[in-house]
């Protein structure tokens, strides 16, 4: 009777192995992230860029000494190959395991990208081997999840992608005393601060207070003239005067970044902010501007300047 019971239990165990472990084990990771297809492709399809977010610090070089398409993680090798704009084939190697996986990505909603990483692992008819293959598939899924987490954690940080930390905020300064002048040459720092000081003088006369650093926008027309717009945030409405207007801002959304450095650094920040707006399909209803945190007259060393840059969005 005991022998019969043992045989029955063994048969049940074997049957359960074949019932619960399929002939093809599907391993997949599916995530959604607020990003763009351009960013996903840039950091998945480039050997150099993959090194920036890969969770293991170990690098594999090819025969020429360049960064290889093969990356190592916990004893598994991942060989990225046959990539295009929204598709990447990854060969996964671990001892006897050598199998292709597929990473795809597409637009889920306006700024939400769905990323899928899938692999199908065939199993053996040998029950012991089948169990080991199931355990290895479970371990592989865990590794894929951690790799995906590392990738997503990297690309959602704007500092990693654009070189600057961008924040979306609500406009706080809604009352501005503004000045608009045109010149044939690029406005010098002293000219800018002369205009700022003229506005401040008028504020004192009217008993109004400046509540934040002065704002600046310089643009060049097709004819080559430079338009200098200065805006000083103030605490209340005051009468306009010749050369100084009082404008009301809608408390809408705005993208903000803090820049350290001179005009070149600020221009680079605006270029990257433009790319950020394009990636996330954001539209600007108004001109961008700088907030002069550092007094540029008192601090002639441009490398020490701190400037906040802003882009209104909706």
List each model region and its residues:
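Ser/Thr- and Asn-enriched, surface-exposed coil loops between beta-strands
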Residues: 83-89, 111
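Generic structural detector for well-ordered beta-strands
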Residues: 30-34, 79, 104-106
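Hydrophobic membrane-insertion alpha-helices, especially the h-region
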Residues: 4-20
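A structural signal for short, hydrophobic beta-strand segments that form beta-sheets
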Residues: 60-63, 77-82
């Amino acid at each position: 009777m005991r022998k019969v019971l043992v045989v029955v239990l063994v048969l049940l165990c074997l049957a359960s192995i074949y019932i619960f472990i399929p002939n093809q084990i599907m391993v997949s990771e599916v995530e959604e992230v607020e990003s763009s297809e351009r960013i996903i492709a840039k950091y998945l399809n480039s050997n150099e860029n993959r090194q920036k977010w890969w969770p293991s610090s170990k690098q594999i070089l090819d025969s020429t000494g360049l960064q290889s398409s093969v990356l190592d993680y916990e004893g598994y090798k991942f060989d990225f190959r046959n990539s295009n704009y929204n598709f990447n084939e990854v060969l996964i190697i671990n001892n006897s395991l050598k199998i292709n996986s597929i990473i795809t990505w597409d637009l889920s909603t306006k700024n939400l990208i769905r990323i899928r990483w899938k692999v199908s692992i065939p199993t053996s008819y040998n029950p012991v081997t089948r169990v080991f293959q199931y355990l290895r598939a479970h371990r592989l899924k865990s590794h894929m999840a951690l790799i995906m987490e590392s990738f997503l954690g990297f690309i959602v940080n704007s500092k990693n992608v654009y070189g600057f930390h961008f924040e979306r905020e609500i406009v706080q300064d809604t009352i501005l005393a503004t000045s608009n002048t045109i010149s044939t040459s690029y406005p010098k720092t002293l000219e800018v601060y002369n205009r700022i000081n003229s506005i401040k003088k008028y504020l004192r006369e009217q008993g109004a207070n400046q509540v934040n650093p002065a704002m600046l926008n310089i643009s060049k027309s097709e004819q080559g003239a430079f338009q200098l717009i200065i805006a000083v945030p103030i605490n209340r409405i005051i009468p306009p005067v010749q050369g100084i207007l009082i404008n009301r801002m809608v408390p809408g959304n705005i993208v903000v970044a803090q820049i350290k450095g001179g005009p070149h650094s600020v221009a680079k920040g605006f270029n990257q902010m433009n790319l950020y707006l394009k990636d996330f399909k954001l539209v600007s209803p108004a001109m961008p501007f700088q907030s002069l945190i550092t007094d540029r007259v008192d601090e002639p060393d441009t490398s020490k300047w701190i400037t906040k840059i802003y882009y209104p969005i909706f």
